[in-house]
Amino acid sequence: MSAQFSLPATGLATQLELSKKLPEDIDALVVPTFKGEDGLELAASGLFDENLEIAIWDLLVAVGATGKQGEVVRIPSIEGIEVDFIVGVGLGDNDSLDDDTLRRAAGDAARSLAGVQHVATTLGAFGLQPAVEGFALGAYNYTGVRSKQKKPLPLEKVTFISLGDKKAAKEEFTVGQIIAESVALCRDLVNAPSSHLYPESYAAIIRDTAEKIGLGVEILDEKKLEKQGFGGILAVGTGSSRKPRLVRLTWAPKKAKKSIALVGKGITFDTGGISLKPGAGMDDMISDMGGSATMVATIIAAARLGVKLNVTATIPLAENMPGGNAFRPGDVITHYGGITSEILNTDAEGRLVLADAIARASEDKPDYLLNVATLTGAQIVALGDRTSGVMGSDEFRDSVALTGRTVGEPAWAMPLPEEIGEDVKSPVADIRNVTGSRSGGMMAAGWYLSHFVGEGIEWAHVDIAGPAYNKAGVYGYIPKRATGVPVRTFVQVLSNLAEQ
């Protein structure tokens, strides 16, 4: 019997429901406000008569509400509205309102309501799906592994008021809920400490989660990896007592016409290996499996949403540790498929496990291959903490980057210059895992991975070294620590491909 593992803590506890009327016994009502040319504007809710709407507006104005983006103003309730208090959430200029502005506002509102039991909101009138996502993800509260629950607890329940078509509202609500839950799963996995999440336990958690929704699951242990020649994964994982794994997930709906392979880096902890990282900030390396968590969440979301696309996810899992058996600078390894690589720096390990996984995924001959990783510090230097770098086949690369910006997960297309590709070549092997230059590190990693993509496959590589893990303050619906970026981007990419 296989060992049983589970995540030590999760962060999404808020209940979501849809209603056509204001429920009884709610604590608060959240309403949208706008910044108009002449001051505060209050969107009519359709729940109350004009006099009550004006009374709400009067009180909001009296306390200085402006309707600007990011504003959250709490006022006492008024006679005739059976709630304890009312919250006005600023959406800015009505003419420039977009989904992510709404999503951020809902996240701001949810965070301000921590500890409240039950609220209702009319924010969904301007976009039910982004309102649902924003509230759920803004309320996300990962308290960690504690002997006693940390207070205040997150917002307990949100009722979304929808006065429109019931069927359409239900569909939009469900999509938002599934996507929010998938992002939360990604966050939970990334937030889990490496003492609890390591290759064996992680593979088991993926298996148990995936099997519940009917995905196909295959797990290769270290013996099968060695037998099949996964030299990159084995090299990285050999220094740890916690041996590597490779997980394969499959979603194969009927009548799907196209296929995509997903690959995500799963380094459950990265010390840098023999090329040891500095001690300061090394604890953040629990997040070095953010790419794998993204792809697990993405394929699960695709299955739950019924996306008509054949999807496989190939997830390499390893822990990069120094030790008597660890791989060394100067080693030459043979990847799955036969390409050899000179190791110049053991802290450039992510591309080694990805290379094996990409080569294996390419054997399935998918139409598209999408891989993601917290891969290079160079991504943060070039694009900052919130914008992902996207490389690969021109058309698919640009499509992925545009989709990210469209859904509110900033991404930017990056080139793969020929001269950097030349620098990836090795004098003693086919390629080397770093170049001799500090320049263009993000693109050098992209070039390295390109050698393993099968011929004729449209490919995109997304570097999320900064965006996957928020070390600064909370903003909108983004908490500290794991962000869940870019799950929403990838779910939309898959949906777009299925509809083509």
Curated annotation (Swiss-Prot):
Record-linked PROSITE patterns: CYTOSOL_AP
Swiss-Prot/TrEMBL keywords: Aminopeptidase, Cytoplasm, Hydrolase, Manganese, Metal-binding, Protease
E.C. no: 3.4.11.1, 3.4.11.10
GO terms (BP aspect): proteolysis
Record carries keyword Ribonucleoprotein: no
Chain sites annotated for binding Mn(2+) 1: D270, D347, E349
Keyword Hydrolase: yes
InterPro entries: Leucine_aapep/pepB, Macro_dom-like, Peptidase_M17_C, Peptidase_M17_leu_NH2_pept, Peptidase_M17_N
Binding annotation for Mn(2+) 2: K265, D270, D288, E349
CDD domains in UniProt: Peptidase_M17
First-listed, main subcellular location of the protein, grouped into a coarse class: cytoplasm
Cellular localisation: Cytoplasm
Catalytic activity: Release of an N-terminal amino acid, Xaa-|-Yaa-, in which Xaa is preferably Leu, but may be other amino acids including Pro although not Arg or Lys, and Yaa may be Pro. Amino acid amides and methyl esters are also readily hydrolyzed, but rates on arylamides are exceedingly low; Release of an N-terminal amino acid, preferentially leucine, but not glutamic or aspartic acids
Location of the active site: K277, R351
SUPFAM superfamilies: Macro domain-like (SSF52949), Zn-dependent exopeptidases (SSF53187)
Cofactor(s) listed: Mn(2+)
Bound cofactor: record note: Binds 2 manganese ions per subunit.
CC terms in the record's Gene Ontology section: cytoplasm
GO molecular function: manganese ion binding; metalloaminopeptidase activity
Function in brief: Presumably involved in the processing and regular turnover of intracellular proteins. Catalyzes the removal of unsubstituted N-terminal amino acids from various peptides.
Matches recorded under NCBIfam families: PRK00913.1-2
Entry's family note: Belongs to the peptidase M17 family.
Listed name of the protein: Probable cytosol aminopeptidase
